[in-house]
Structures are given as structure tokens and as C-alpha cells.
Amino acid sequence: MSLRFLLGRSGSGKTTACLEEIRRQLQEDPKGRTIVYLVPEQMTFQCEYALIHTEGTEGMIRAQVFSFPRLAWRVLQETGGMNRYHVHDVGVQMMIRKIIEQRKQELKLFGRAADKSGFVEQLHEMIAECKRYCLTPDELRRHAGVLESGSGQPGRRLLADKLSDVALVYEELERSLLGHYLDSEDYLRLLVEHIPRSSYLHGADIYIDGFHHFSPQEYMVIEQLLHRCRRVTVCLTADRPYDVGMPDELDLFYLPAQTYRQLRELALANDIMIESPVVLSVNRRHQDKALAHLEEQFHRRPLLPYEAETDAICLYEAANRRAEIEAVAREIIRLVRDEGARYRDIALIIRQTEAYRDLVKTVFFDFDIPYFMDEKEPMHYHPLIELVRAALETVVTRWRYEAVFRAVKTDLLFPVDGDLAMWREAADKLENYVLAHGVKGEKWTSDERWTYRRYQALDGLNVPQTDEERQFEDKLNEWREALAAPLRRLERRLRRAADGRGLCTALYLFLEELQIPKKLEQMSAQAEADGRLVEARQHEQAWNAVVDLLDQYVEMLGAEPLPLAEFAKIIEAGLDRLEFALVPPAIDQVIVAQLDRSRLIDVKYAFIIGVNDGVIPAKVKDEGLVAEVEREQLRELGVALAPGGREQLFYDPFFVYLALACPSRRLYVTYPLADGEGKALMPSPLIKQLVQLFPRVSVHLCGNDPFDAPEEKPETFVTVPRATQTYLISQLRAWKRNYGIDPLWWDVYNVLISHPEWRARVEQAVSGLFYTNQAVLKREWSRRLYGKKIQASVSRMEQFQKCPYAHFASHGLRLKERNVFRLEAPDVGQLFHAAIKQIADRVREQHLDWKQLSRSECERLSAEAVERIAPLIQQQVLSSSNRYEYMKRKLKNVVARTTHVLSEHARASGFAPVGFELSFGPGGDLPPLRFQLRDGTVMELVGRIDRVDKAESSQGVLLRIIDYKSSAKTLDLTEVYYGLALQMFTYLDIVLTYAEQLVGEPALPAGVLYFHIHNPIIQAKQWLDNEMEVARKLLEPFRMRGLLLADAETIRLMDSQTENGQWSLIVPAQLTRTGAIHSRSSVASASDFAALRQHVRRLFVDIGGQIADGVVSIAPYKLKNKTACEFCAFKPVCQFDEALSGNGYRKLTPQTKDAVIETLGKREEES
């Protein structure tokens, strides 16, 4: 029995020496004593591959490559001990959660933290660390007692309480697992116990390689191996034996020196012979002198510069991380294509895997680079995991929309042999219905049939259901039953379950009834047929993982009664920790490795990426239950735990050294100057160190495309078709903007366009350069869309003027937004309009007078109107919750306040309403306005006028238009001029054109006014002394805005209290003390009103002609800071982009009121 050290710096050939010695023994005696090559988990495949591909070796029966856990599994298989149930981390955490719940009252600190996210995982990691470092619960209690008795040092009591709580949970966990279960940390303890009984290891030769330090458990295993085996050879990356004297903590080899000393002391304590250390002093790896110089001089002070030219060390500075990875990918392609490298010769070494993981996957896919990432992928996004999570959330949250449709969108609720496309469309329609009707809770689970009505007008209570609506309703209920029935059965079983076993059984039956194994098998077969082999294997893994999770729960908590919400929380925590098994690397792949974790063999080209400040050297992270300061306190007590932040800071140069010394031919060190959000990043101090060490090596700037990297030759961007196409399009875009490009890119274009596989892709990409995002609708298609007679509302005409494409999307394609079950501004506006109409009807029916309405009558009429209308708004949304009931009360107050103000207006006004919600169009109260368009198409304007008032004056009958608005609105003649606001003058034109039909005689225009329906808070700078001031303050916010006839008599008719030079509280006008109209009044002459009416008519004819001609241009207006795109629902459809040729705003010039009236007046004179 002996211990032998094989020492040497990185690249000295330690691994090669071990492998050659093993090969030699295999060749001499293939069936001799056991040879075990013990390496870290991530190194096992490479070592097995190296052994298998040994020339002259007929087999390797006697030699096997193991990691510590796999060696434990092999020995326990031989000696017994595998009969206990293996509990994964998820199962252990379930047990910890149960212990905390049961012993909460005894816990000093953790009882309050138990429900916090991630706490159980942290506690489990702490207990696992205690096991690895052979700390028992009793020892933890003893150390807690020492800390508690000590004084004068801050935080000792807190740490004592932590240790006490950890000890309590740890002890209870061990008691629960004892004799029945094994967790991941128990295998090495069992291995220690069973090595003495293992005939497999008796007299074996053990080679331990790839480790730099060991945990106490691993030291105990090595101790037993020293007793049982013939020889244990330990390879360490160290410059010399450390039999006498330890290096300084800042020494590069401090970590392996510690390991050397501990192993030596272990052998001496057990009377094991220590052979003379074998020190390999020659650098066998580095074929280039510069790399050898780097390995030798790194971390030496002072630095000895390497003055010769070299291409073995390359420094890349990139604009951002994507540019960095693309530059690396281009260089990998060049190495393989031009220098004969194999992908397996290349390694990507990363410390910040979370920042680069997805980027590497995306870029390497674009460049067709095969790679193996030494990192397990979480199962979060697998459909089965999402189904289980969403199904439990559906039950716990009582069928919330989001949870239900997360389950539906996994596709796993659909029938196993159903048409997937058909069921997805059905699910979309079902989702639209649920969103529009606010379906949740009992609406899903009751037997009550869902009803469907496409339209539900506020005054159309008895409209019969159409055959089309009835057919859709039948389909809707059929889809609902098919998708909701499995979830309903799951809910019933879960709520009947008496314990954890019952809950897991309910969930398993749910998955079985849905035939999940068969569906996943189909998905796997499809993925395999499409060449997605990794995905094909993942489907089976996901099913096994979920079933195993349920098994673990039953084993750990099966007999425990548990609230459903707590069960769902535990299962979700378990699902979050599920990971796909690592797929073994293929023969020829780039290895993507983590700087601190991976062990690499036979790498010729290494790329160390993301070398920024804060990454190398690494920042100390104070994570876990025990803080860095507390670890220091424990270390003072002699407690051995995993290296804390301080030690890791000392060890960091060693791991950087290993990465730098890894390649045998060329080293690339890269760093970005900005992250994905554009925030600046600083290069690591390592970059400065390398520049000082190699002064002849310059930093190479990498850009996103050839224009960003003038140093690079254009041909370096020509790699594989997919990636090259991206650069080609970038160059052609520059050429289109009259920039010069290298002739090489035309050759690239010709090659790609001549290739059958890439021709269509290139043509599609190139077409985008000349894409104008505009289209013309032929006149015949316009006729088919809109018909020979166009019936249009005024708002439709306005929409066309704002943007012709928005009109086409809305009225041609008939696109509309999803209807969502919530109260929105248009719904409030509808309610206000309908309420005022119904109040006016009740005033007329009950023979009341607007002028005589009291405040209480206004409140009564308003409350009754809102109560009648509310059930017809958005599927009774105002009755769906306490919040909406409160909003309904607020709306009643608004309507009551408005009604009272209207009553006050009536008292002061000579105008009286002659119509509310007056319709015009075929079958309406008034005929439509008709226009003959230039192609013979007839256009009719239809709509509804909120209110028309009439008054008698010395000149004759006066008519005015009042439009109710739920938000403040002013009449801007600029918008009228450009056709953006046509309603008011169209309504005025309608009532004046058909005045004889409406009031029995011709009429004159009195004005157009907006009335703001609201319930404002009265603000005053000082105390209001009398009722008159209060009344004035109450009426001021309700002053109507608009345009009035410039006639003093008309203004007095609108407000009899406008004398004495005061502003009217009703209309936007003021009379001076002499009775003249004040210049600030918003007025226009009768001829001006006529000119505005004629202008609006001309606009309608022009708009109608353009619609008939098929104008669908994407031409949104821009007026000051307002644009048509601001609130447009069709932005995702039109894809308006000012950067595209032909896309731009129609910029409208603001006009003053006088300028508009003058322009229109001149036009009238000319006509």
C-alpha cells in the first residue's frame, strides 16, 4: 500500500503520463488487477475516449474511469447497500419543508423564513455542505454553544441561532432518512464503510487526476483506498513537492499545495508508505514558445516581457457580447476551414455562463458549429412541466384565465389523435370568448351552458339569436367540455384527497387520462423525423422526471395531510429544479466549458470569453445561509466548511492560470465593451497584464459587420451560408445608401443566388432592401370589398383622413382588437350617452321639465338609468366585482352631476332639445347625406347625433349641435380643415339640410358645442363667501366648447346671464357691457358656417373617391405632436417604419381659426 504524487505545472504531461502508464499495464496484462482512473464527473467521457482509442490495446476490462459518485455506485453494487430508496434533491427538500412545518415552534430563526422563496433550497445546500465536510448535528450544537457563551464579537448570537436551527433540521432529516433512504451526499459515506469489503478494489491501482482539492468526505474515501489498494497515484498541478513549508496564500499554487500537505499527513497518520514524488518539469503541451512563456511567467513579479512576434496569443475587443461571439465563431470556422483544425480541438471557456449561454446557442446555430455545453438545461419550458404547473394553478386559483390557457397552450389537453391546427384555432376562439366574458371560477365548472351573442346593443334587449350565433355557441360549449373536463376531474380528485399519496395519485391519473406518454411519444417521433435529436430525447426524460417527482413526494410526504395550495407550492418547487440529463458529446464538437468547473484534455485552441472587470478576477459573492463574516468566525473555531469568498479570491488566479495554459497551439482572450443593454463594461486587469507580457501583440477590434471592423479582411466574414447571408445583406444595405463595398460581396451574392437551397432565402432577404411597405388595392377589389353603395359613418371618414391604411384594416379587412372583459373609455362613453338619452325619455314620458328638475330628481333619474344600462355593458362587467360595483356608484354620481348641470343650463337658456340620439341614414330619424362619386359609386353618410337644440330668434329658427364627451374636447378648425374632425359640421349640415323634416321649417346654424360629462372637484384659492360664488364655481367646469354664430341675440338665447361683461358659464362667449361680442369669443359668421359645411362636403366626396379607387397607403398624419399612430390598434399590421423607403408621416401645418375661415371663404368666392 503506497501513496505516490505525480506533480507538475499545467502542460507538463501528468494526465498523459497516467494514461500511458495505464495503457502499458493493459497491454502487458489485459486481465490483471483492477485499475481505477478517478476523475471529476465532467472529465470522465474524455478520459474514457482517450483510453478506448489506444493503439495496440485489445480491450480495457481491468481499467475503468470513475467519478467519486460512480465509484460509490460500483462498490455498493458489489458489497450491498443499494437496497435503500434513492432520494433526489427535490425529495430531500420536501422532507426539509415538512420538518420545518412540524418543528416551527422550536426554531429560533428559520421559522419565520421558511415560506420565503429559495429558503428551503439554501438550507438543503447548507446541510449538504455539512455532510460533505463531515459536520454532525451534535458538532453544530457544540459550536453554537461556544458562540453563544462568547461575548464582545458582533453577530455571534445570530450565528449561534443559525447553527442551532440547522442542527435541529439536519438531525431530524437524518432520523427520517435512516435505514430507508439515501440522498446524494450519503453515497461517499457508504463508500467509506464498504471499501474494506470490496474485492473489486483489493490490490487495485488507483489514479486520481483532475482534482485540485477534496472535501473531507473525499479525503475519507482516499484514506480507505490507501488501506485497500496497492497504490494510489494522485496528480496535482503544482510546481514542486511541499513536504516542508507552505507557500504564501497569494502564491499561485497555494490550493494544490494545501491538498498535497493534507494527503501527505493523511498517509503518515495511517502508516502508508509515501513514494518519492514524481515531478514533471518539462512543458510538453505548448508547441509555441509564447504559450510556454505565458504558462511560466503568469503571476510572476516582475513580469518578463516576450519581445518576439507571435500569433499564438490573440486579444479581441468587441463592441458588445454578440459581436464578440460572432467574431469567435468566424475564427472557429477559419481554423477548421483553413488550418485543418477539428471542432474537438477547440474549447470555449466562460465564467459568466448566464450572460453567454443563449448567445452561444444562437450564434453557433447560425454558423453551423457543433458544440457541447457542459451544463444541464432546466426543464422549465417543456410542455409537460408547464401543463402540471398550470393545471395545479388552475385549481388553486379557481380557474383564473391565465392559468387555464397556459395549460391549453401546451397542446397536451387536445385529443391524442385530433387535428392539431384545428384544435389550436378552436382554443384561440375559446380564449377570445373567455377574455370577452370574464369567464372564471364557477363559470368553468358549472353545468350552465355558455351563451353567445355577437352584438348586444344598449337598446336592443330582445334581438333574436341568429343561426350563425347558435352554431358557434354549440361549438363553443363542445370545445369547453373537451378542454375543461380533464381539469374538472383533476380538481374533484384533488379536493377529495386525504393525504399526499391521494394528491399525487390525482395528478398522475390526470396525466394518464390525457394519454401524456403517447402524446410525448408522438412529439418525440416528430422531432426525430425533423432531425431535432436532442429534443426527441428530452420528451421521454420529462415524463420520467415528473413521475419520479411524484414518487419522491409519496415516499417523503405520502402519509401527510396537506392543504392543496401547499401541495401545489411544493410540486412547483420540485418542477423548477428538474433538469435534462447532459447529452454525451459527439466525437467532433466544440466544448463550451465553465472556467471554474470544467476539466479539459487535449485542447489545441482555447477561447476565453467575457474577460471583463468583475468577472476576472471574480467578485466575492456573499450567498447562502452563512455569510462570509460568519464563515470566518467558524474558521476561528476550527470548523471546516467549503471555501468562502476570501479563499475563492485567493484561488482565482490558479483557475485563470489553468485556463490560460489550456491550449497547445493558440490562445484567444476576448472581452466586450458593452452588455446587451448598451451599458459600458471595462476590460479585466488580466488584459493589461497580457499586453505587458506580450508587447508585440495588439488588440484586435471586432465589430458586428465589416463596416464596424475595417481591420478585418472581407473574406473573414464569408463563413457558412446562413451567417454570410446576414453580412451580405448588411453590405447591400450600405451599397443602397451609396456607400462603397468590396467587390467580394457581389461574388458572394452570385454564389448564394446560384445555390438551390439558399436562393429563395437570399431573394427574400434582398427584397427587404427594396421593400417600401406600401401596396395598391385595385379598383375592382375595392368594389368587391365595399360594394357599389358605401354606407359610412363620419368617424370612418375621419379615420381615412388620419391614415388610409388604418381605414382599410378596419373596414376593408375588418380587423379588430380582442374584446376584453374590462371597462374601458369607449364603454364609459356609451354608458353616458345611453343614460342621458334614457333620462331625456323619462323626462318626456313623465311630463317633467328640464328647467324644473330638482337635485334629488336628477339623482333618482340618473341612478335608474345607470342601473338599467349597466347589465348591457361588457357582459355585465359592472356587476362582476366589488371594485366594479364601486365604479358603478361613481358613474351614477357623474351622470347625476351632469343631469343637474343640464337642468341649470336649461334654466338659463332659450334653447330646448328637439332630439336626443337622433339617427340619420336609411330607416333613421333623418335621411342620410348622399354623394355621387366620380366612378358612379353612391356613398351615404349614416350615424347618430347626441343632441339637437332649437330656439326661436328674430331671424328665424336656430339649431345647434351638442356632442357629449367623456373627456375634455375642443373644436380645432385645423383638424376640421384637414378632415380629422368632421363630426360636428356634418351633424350641423344634416339638421340644417333636413330642418323642415325635423322642426317643420328651414333653420339657421346657431353653433356646435362639446359638453364634457364629468364630476370635477371644485378648487378655489380662497373661501367662497356666498351661494352665487359656489354656484358659479360648480358650473365653470361644464362650460361647453365649440363654435357659435357671431350674433349677440343667439348668444343671449344660449345664456341669458351673459350681460355685464362676464364670460358665459354655459358657452365659450362673452358680451361686452355695450352688448357687443367680445373678441375672445369663439364665434363665426353665418357665411363662415356655410363655407365650413361646403368644405366638409367636398372632403367627403374626395375621401369616398379615394376609397372607391382602392387607396390603402400607409400615410399617417402628424400635426404638431399628435400622430395617427399614437393610439392606433393596427401598428403591428402595417409595420410603419420611417426608416423604410416610402414610409413617412403626412406632416400637416397648423392653421389659426382666422386663416382657415379666410382660406375657405376665398374658395367659396372662387366656386
UniProtKB/Swiss-Prot annotation:
Protein name from the UniProt record: ATP-dependent helicase/deoxyribonuclease subunit B
NCBIfam families: addB_Gpos (TIGR02773)
Record keyword Nucleotide-binding present: yes
Any one Gene Ontology BP term: double-strand break repair via homologous recombination
PROSITE patterns per record: UVRD_HELICASE_ATP_BIND, UVRD_HELICASE_CTER
Stated family: Belongs to the helicase family. AddB/RexB type 1 subfamily.
InterPro entries for the chain: ADDB_N, DNA_helicase_suAddB, DNA_helicase_UvrD-like_C, P-loop_NTPase, PDDEXK_AddAB-type
Domain UvrD-like helicase C-terminal: start-end pairs: 282-588
Pfam families in UniProt: ADDB_N, PDDEXK_1
Residues reported in the UniProt entry to bind ATP: 8-15
Keyword Chaperone: no
GN (gene name): addB
Assembly information from the UniProt record: Heterodimer of AddA and AddB.
Domain UvrD-like helicase ATP-binding: residue ranges: 1-359
EC number of this enzyme: 3.1.-.-
